[in-house]
Amino acid sequence: VKRNYLPLKTTVKVSTQTQLPLHLVITHPQYRFVDLFAGIGGFRIALEKLGGRCSGYSEIDKQAIQVYQQNFISYLNSDEIAFGDVSKISNLPDNLDLIVGGVPCQPWSVAGCLRGFEDPRGKLWFDVIKLVQKSQPKSFIFENVSGLASPRNRENLELIIDELTSCGYQVYWQLLNAYDFGLPQNRERVFIVGIRKNIDNYERFKFPLPLGIHPKVLDILEDIKNIQPVKKVKLSADTLFNGFVPPSRTRFQKEDELNDFFIFSDLRNGHTTIHSWDIIKTTERQKSICLALLKLRRSKKYGEKDGHPVAFSTFLEIIPDLKIEELNQLVSLGICWQTTAGKYEFINSKNMTGINGIYRIILPTADIIPTLTATGAKDYIATISITATHPQEYKQLFLKKIYKPKKFREITPQDARKLQGFPDNFIYHPQSAIAKKQFGNAVPITVVQAVARNLLEIILPN
């Protein structure tokens, strides 16, 4: 019987069988590795596919350990070492070929406020470096969020690389995106690879090139079928962006096509932005007042950062005939609120919090899903597709055919499993929120496999 859930239980027990192919456990391994910050085993799946055997793993999250043991620990390897807290490991097994790990990324992410080494989790890098120095494996692969390579954190990245280099390694790093390795997810991560300098050809390592395989979101959706691919109409920048293309657009957002997602936000005004005044019944006059607030609250004239509540007198600069009663009507409608200073601001005034619990609805015909995160973005997937020839028509079709009839659903653990490249027989946590958090913390398996394959060609030439 195929299982995709964990048995409900209160204690962690070792399974008497593993859901992964048993030959991965009982055949002679080609190399040995240790799995630090193991999570639910993304690194391990990739490395076992390439003939490796795990000599031990380190993880402190009890729910992640439960999932990890359910999938990887059986009577055949029940003596495998569980190291626990990385900061408390004194010794690793001798003669390791490889150490891997997704060092906690929150200190370097936007969600973690980019605190870096100021965050205790950021200091775990030094524990990792000490283990590399002491155990001297042939090589290592570490993964982290792209924020570690941002200009703000570049000095920290260089410090990490310098410290690892001083341990006797040639160190390489590169940003790699899961989309380039056969997964329909925009997930860019830093990969840091080191090879001990007494290994032959250590200087010849190269990061893998993109595979050129690009499945669509539809390919990973098990419950949404019979949707034909959409041929998008080419439109001018004037039509889409009023002549100015926002610099924040990603490589997946084409400058001559309609977006394949809709953002719910009162803070921006893109061609697929849904505002609260699009959802709540409002007059054209009320809509124009809301757009005026959107513009004024972002003006540098009132401060360096955007998000400034706007006074009635400021509104009069661009709407001279505005009545204060009109602003108070928007307060009554639940679109705005009035501060203690008598200024006006949107109720939905935080970026990425969305409206009515929704931040983004992605069309099933999209090329990618945005990055899965441990914190869980308020993203949904539409269950039908739409197409249009003009932004306004597109927006109205979305509201009429998808939003109002609720033709959308949450991203499920099954979706997350496929977006990260985990196999179909992987047993994930029975609670959806926990499972999605764990997949959001995981590494994309196809990327690890591609990096590891190139590394193994150096450290295992035979």
Predicted regions, residues:
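Class I S-adenosyl-L-methionine
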Residues: I89-L96, A111-I362
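Conserved beta-strand scaffold positions in the cores of enzyme catalytic domains, especially
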Residues: F33, Y57, I81-A82, V171-W173, ...
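Short Gly/aromatic-enriched secondary-structure transition segments
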Residues: N71, F207-P210, I386-T389
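Glycine-centered loop/turn positions within well-structured domains
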Residues: Q106, D219-K225, K378, F426
